[in-house]
Design a protein with these regions (language model features):
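Conserved ABC ATPase "signature" region
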Residues: 19-26, 118, 122, 129-147
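Conserved ABC ATPase signature
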Residues: 151-155
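Catalytic Walker B motif of ABC-type/P-loop ATPase nucleotide-binding domains
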Residues: 176-179
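Helical segment within the ABC ATPase nucleotide-binding domain
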Residues: 191-203
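A short, surface-exposed alpha-helical micro-motif characterized by mixed small hydrophobic
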Residues: 218-220
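ABC ATPase "signature
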Residues: 236-237
């Protein structure tokens, strides 16, 4: 179970006006401003749920995921995931989570996919029997057999994303964080990724938290959405709670953003 209660996160960033004189002045006298990325964020996600965590750019989605994965520490509030505080019990915590970023890679670009998998086996200290079992299962489910000996840089985007998902699941995590997992993929690759995620959730009861701007992904994969804007939770419910009188989810979401001035 994932529980966040009254979490706040603020970033201190330097500010200056454009121009050489302002840049020179900033060398001797820096001015700062504070950006409130998360403001009193609270929610609970039960085991096996598939949740869409959505909002416009700069809403606080990435900050939330980084706190949940143990990368960031909030100034206020509490976060408990399966009995662990992510940033305090990070080594133990990362054994139970998988993270996929659509625009970043955890694979090594100049070596075959299999070499990256072998290295991840050592990083996560996966036993050989468990590793072989998971690799065989993931290779079959994601159709990776012809890709394992190929250097990552030679893969298409769709092929690489399937390998990224497999890499994040080799250690059999209980929770999977997906950040734009289908960005840039063609229609066939998108369907393959969606089908796999649904099958994973059904067969292993894996908790899935999906952040994306692709509402087709949200509609196909999740039964609950949490909508964040300007660092605050604006809605926690279903797609129907937003859509109501609109023909499409995108149209309804745009109207929702306008009504909340975000």
């Amino acid at each position: 179970m994932i529980t966040m209660q009254h979490v706040r996160k603020t970033y201190k960033v330097s500010k200056r006006d454009a121009g050489f004189s302002s840049a020179f002045k900033a060398l001797f006298h820096k001015e700062y401003e504070y950006i409130h990325a998360l403001d009193d964020v609270s929610f609970t996600i039960c085991d096996g749920e598939m949740v869409g965590y959505i909002g416009p750019n700069g809403a606080g989605k990435s900050s939330t995921i980084k706190i949940l994965s143990g990368i960031l520490t909030p100034e206020e509030g509490t976060c408990l995931i399966n009995g662990l505080i992510p940033w305090k019990n990070r080594i133990e915590h990362v054994k139970n989570i998988g993270v996929v970023f659509g625009q970043r890679s955890q694979l090594w670009w100049d070596v075959p996919v299999m070499d990256s998998f072998e290295l991840l086996k050592e990083i996560y200290k996966i036993s050989t029997p468990s590793y072989n079992h998971n690799l065989e299962q993931l290779t079959d489910m994601l159709n990776l057999s012809e890709l394992l000996k190929t250097p990552v840089r030679q893969l298409s985007l769709g092929q690489r994303m399937r390998c990224e998902i497999a890499a994040s699941l080799l250690h059999d995590p209980k929770i999977l964080f997906l950040d734009e997992p289908t960005i840039g993929l063609d229609a066939v690759s998108k369907l393959a990724v969606r089908d796999f995620i649904l099958k994973l959730n059904k067969e292993k009861n894996t908790t899935v938290i999906l952040t994306t701007h692709d509402m087709q992904d949200i509609e196909a994969l999740t039964n609950r959405i949490i909508l964040i804007g300007k660092g605050s939770i604006l809605l926690d419910g279903t797609i129907d709670d937003i859509r109501k009188d609109y023909d499409s989810t995108e149209e309804a979401l745009a109207a929702f953003y306008r009504s909340h001035n975000i």
